Amino acid sequence: LDVLHNESCIYAADEPIEFKLRIKTKVPNIGDMSFRILVWQADETPIEIAFTKTFANINEIGEYDVEVAINKHNLAPGLYKLTIILSGGTSNANSENLDYVYPAFVFEILHADGTARTWPRQWGWVQLRDVDVKLIEE
């Protein structure tokens, strides 16, 4: 796994998390492939999961490079781990777990402005950043 554009693995709350993986297949005819990406709190509590769309149909033995971008993670400031699970199978059936990496990497989320203000754990782990509020005039 190669982390792209951020070797320190410290991200602002509004910054995408991007990485590249190399997949090596040892058997032919795997078929459709997708990822499940699981985000864990530093204490091993699962926080978020993403199910990707099928990104390839693999029928040949070989090596394949894949880029992944988590554009809006909504994570609150803190320390996290990422698990990447590679799944195979047709898109209209249950997929089979082919392989996984845990932890794929450890990363930290800071406030969007880069400051290190306190984020009390009782506030939660997911940050809702797209909320509109307006005053209702009488």
Identify the residue ranges that each predicted region occupies:
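Localized sequence-composition bias
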Residues: 1-138
